[in-house]
Design a protein with these regions (language model features):
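Short, structured coil/loop segments at alpha-helix boundaries
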Residues: 53-58, 88-94, 147
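Generic alpha-helix signal with a bias toward terminal, lower-confidence helices
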Residues: 45-47, 56, 62, 67, ...
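A short, basic-hydrophobic beta/loop patch
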Residues: 27, 109-153
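Short alpha-helix boundary/capping and kink motifs at helix termini
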Residues: 6-14, 18, 65-122, 135
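Extended aliphatic helical segments
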Residues: 31, 39, 60, 72, ...
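Short, intrinsically disordered low-complexity segments
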Residues: 2, 23, 53, 67-70, ...
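N-terminal extension/subdomain marker
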Residues: 2-59
Length: 153
């Protein structure tokens, strides 16, 4: 137990000093990401706010309903990023660092929300969490809900 506390303290110190490579190496060895069993309620509102920038209101409502009724499943971090045509954010991104601090403290992260659109998949909520997971282990499983079959405009 003391060994984990020392590793966590070293990781936090490395992170504070900006030595992100050392922090990442330490995290890979000592901290596995822990996930909530289901999506936090506020994440649905965040997903709908993001989707309102990309879709019309009817589609946003449809996506929200599909996301709320979808079951939690898992996909590898690299596959989520590849399907959404996104690159992972670096560990020094403020949102990724916030989630890394949560992981170091043992806090569970909320599953991700993904929608499939005619132009491909998109991460409606949880891009920072997927990026963190990818940076720690690109092939690690990330829990998510997927909404598909949205009405076309």
């Amino acid at each position: 137990m003391a060994k984990n506390k020392k590793a966590e303290a070293k990781a936090a110190k490395d992170l504070k000093q900006g030595d992100l490579k050392a922090a990442r190496d330490t995290q890979e060895a000592t901290v596995g990401l822990k996930w909530l069993g289901d999506v936090a309620e506020h994440d649905f509102a965040a997903a709908e706010a993001y989707l309102s920038l990309r879709l019309d209101p009817t589609q946003v409502d449809d996506a929200g309903k599909h996301l709320r009724s979808a079951k939690v499943t898992t996909r590898r971090a690299n596959d989520i990023l590849r399907a959404s045509n996104r690159d992972p954010l670096p560990l020094d991104d403020p949102g990724v660092m916030r989630d890394l601090r949560k992981a170091i403290s043992g806090e569970k992260l909320s599953p991700v929300l993904v929608v499939t659109l005619p132009q491909g998949a998109d991460i409606a909520d949880g891009y920072h969490r997927v990026s963190l997971a990818y940076n720690l282990n690109p092939f690690g499983d990330v829990p998510l809900r997927i909404a598909s079959e949205l009405r076309k405009k």
